[in-house]
Amino acid sequence: MKDLPIIALDFESKEKVNRFLDLFDESLFVKVGMELFYQEGPQLINEIKERGHDVFLDLKLHDIPNTVGKAMEGLAKLNVDLVNVHAAGGVKMMSEAIKGLRKHNEHTKIIAVTQLTSTTEDMLRHEQNIQTSIEEAVLNYAKLANATGLDGVVCSPLESRMLTEKLGASFLKVTPGIRPKGASQDDQHRITTPEEARQLGSTHIVVGRPITQSDNPVESYHKIKESWLV
């Protein structure tokens, strides 16, 4: 996978995606999430790949093991670069996801969501009834993902250093919640700058609104890219 900031294509239509991608004359690493995939379907993935871009298909699969395994068989045929599941689905579900993916595809990386970057300590305790710190909850899910054979996790950059120490540098830490200095944090809570994420051990960062909603998306992307790759 490219060592580039992953741009979250948080658009509701193919037309808006194409207008955005037309601004760039280089190969990108982009994320397609639920909103866009459910609106436009697999054909959009094929079109983005044909443009030469890497794709992270961010659907966060979470269901019974058999359903997730069968769903992953279908997604494997899209030949994206990165897919994910929810670690909360458990070891059996994650194992079936790997089996489904590998029936048709050997190169796509698969990672697990631990805790969303919008989650706070209060939400963890009072809504999820998990009576540990966010760091401990993330580490527990990351250990399960690692033991199951997944390539890494989605986590906050604030947990990246801990996960590198516990699970090694090669274990992927894909981190949303990235904001340039001075940018609005929107609905994210556990956030850092691109430079801080690199220093903390994140292997990939995901950036959406600071690029896609910028007055000059190309300039904003290059500034974030430069700060990430230093």
Swiss-Prot record:
GO CC term (a single one): cytosol
Enzyme class: lyase
Pathways involved: Pyrimidine metabolism; UMP biosynthesis via de novo pathway; UMP from orotate: step 2/2
Biological process according to GO: 'de novo' pyrimidine nucleobase biosynthetic process; 'de novo' UMP biosynthetic process
Active-site residues annotated for this sequence: 60
EC assignment: 4.1.1.23
Cross-referenced SMART domains: OMPdecase
Pfam families from the UniProt entry: OMPdecase (PF00215)
Function comment: Catalyzes the decarboxylation of orotidine 5'-monophosphate (OMP) to uridine 5'-monophosphate (UMP).
Family statement: Belongs to the OMP decarboxylase family. Type 1 subfamily.
Protein known as: Orotidine 5'-phosphate decarboxylase
Protein's organism: Staphylococcus aureus (strain bovine RF122 / ET3-1)
Lineage: Bacteria, Bacillati, Bacillota, Bacilli, Bacillales
Gene: pyrF
